[in-house]
């Protein structure tokens, strides 16, 4: 589907469903801050002239605040599609949606695009997080990426956090956001709603939010 126009139809279906579900939960539970949703989007769709209009339609239809929608595009897609330009990203940022670079660090690309593209966050590829405890080289790369995001004033998110040791090391290096099986396994709608309810009423917490032991 990635190589055909079918991917745009798939992207649109996922975007609409995700925005509708997140806004439903925001209205039901009034979390503070409001829930946001990350949606992976194809390079073919990013450069589409119709994407901006479609997002306006979906955000208006669902009532979701634009900054609650975070579009993810892989670094490899940026490298592999020279027609992805800063202008394409700017068209989306003007709506108020956020843009995140997924799988950062494995694209073998020039870092020049980081200063030219209006992005909100970098997501450190899981391949660097996997060996962050044993491999000092990988740890140095993660630390360098974190330092880079601070200089660029964008968020940094670690992918593939699967152990408490990895989480502790990432915290030590200054990374405050992460995703992975240690934090939560993938959840379907009912189980995600149950977790939202537990967190709202103080009966459940994610590992990343639990207070550290003294």
Tell me what each language-model feature is.
Residues 23-27, 94, 172:
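Regular, well-ordered alpha-helical segments
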Residues 40-49, 68-83, 95-214:
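EAL-family c-di-GMP phosphodiesterase catalytic domain
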Residues 88:
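Conserved functional hotspot residues or short segments at active or partner-binding sites
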Residues 6-85, 160:
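Catalytic core of bacterial c-di-GMP phosphodiesterases, primarily the EAL and HD-GYP domains
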């Amino acid at each position: 589907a990635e190589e055909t126009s079918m991917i745009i139809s798939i992207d649109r279906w996922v975007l609409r469903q995700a925005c509708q579900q997140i806004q439903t939960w925001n209205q039901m539970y009034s979390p503070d801050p409001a829930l946001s949703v990350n949606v992976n989007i194809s390079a073919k769709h990013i450069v589409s002239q119709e994407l901006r209009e479609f997002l306006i339609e979906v955000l208006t239809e669902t009532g979701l605040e634009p900054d609650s929608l975070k579009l993810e595009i892989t670094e490899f897609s940026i490298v592999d599609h020279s027609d992805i330009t800063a202008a394409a990203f700017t068209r989306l940022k003007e709506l108020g949606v956020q843009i995140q670079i997924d799988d950062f660090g494995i694209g073998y690309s020039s870092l020049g695009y980081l200063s030219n593209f209006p992005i909100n966050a970098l997501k450190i590829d899981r391949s660097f997080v996997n060996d962050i405890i044993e491999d000092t080289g990988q740890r140095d790369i993660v630390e360098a990426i974190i330092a880079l995001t601070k200089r660029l004033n964008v968020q940094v998110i670690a992918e593939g956090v699967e152990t408490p040791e990895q989480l502790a090391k990432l915290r030590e290096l200054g990374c405050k956001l992460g995703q992975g099986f240690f934090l939560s396994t993938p959840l379907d709608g009912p189980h995600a709603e149950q977790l939202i309810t537990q967190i709202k009423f103080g009966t459940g917490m994610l590992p990343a939010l639990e207070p550290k032991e003294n």
